[in-house]
Amino acid sequence: MSRSKQTDEKKQARKAVGERRSPFASGMDFETSEAYNVLRTNIILSLPHKRRGNIVGTTSSAPHEGKSYTSVNLSYALAKNGSRTLLVSADMRKPTVEGYYEVPLSPGLSNLLVGSVPQDSLMEVIRPLPEYSENLFLLPAGDIPPNPSELLGSQNMGDLLRKLATLFDFIIVDLPPVTTVVDPVAVSPNLDGMLVV
């Protein structure tokens, strides 16, 4: 087999894996897609009527219940509806959101919170996702820290979310399961709402 043919096959395989992991790119059925649109509408109606800066955390009671999948699809539904939407990968223990978009973990949230990346470089760390929607952006988790709950409950996290709230209509914060670690509780004072999957 020729080298160029092998390269083409590898590209196709990577594309297929990306499409399989990216829920909307793979052609979700109507009922599932509509369920996320209903969820989007319910969240919009249940939050304070702010034009910008609605911050919603997503968590679950246990691992493998679909909270990251829900975060990805909810963010997409909000962005497709015309809202400038940021998905924050804040499960710094087992980040998975980045895999849906084939985006590297670092630099990201943890780097901003510990100061290894200055907050004035924020827009260099946030990744636009125009192949999905011109309104969709991702803040990756960053390097895995030894103290995620302390970082999420820190003043730096509150300051960062307030700054992000001036830049985006919706911020979806993907968090670890609430019954396994304290991370969702630590960040909750800075959220407008919490979705438990």
What does each model-found stretch correspond to?
Residues 1-43:
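Acidic-aromatic/histidine active-site loop/patch
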Residues 19-20, 39, 112, 138-139, ...:
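Conserved beta-strand/loop subsegment of P-loop NTPase cores
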Residues 26-28, 106-117, 143-153, 196-197:
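Flexible beta-alpha connector loops of hexameric P-loop NTPases
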Residues 31-99:
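Walker A/P-loop phosphate-binding motif and the immediately C-terminal alpha-helix
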Residues 57-59, 88, 140-141, 173-174, ...:
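Conserved beta-strand segments of the P-loop GTPase G domain that flank and frequently precede/overlap
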Residues 78-138:
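Phosphate-binding loop that captures ATP/GTP phosphates
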Residues 128, 141-182:
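Phosphate-binding/switch loop-helix module in NTP-utilizing enzymes
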Residues 177-197:
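Conserved P-loop NTPase nucleotide-binding/switch module
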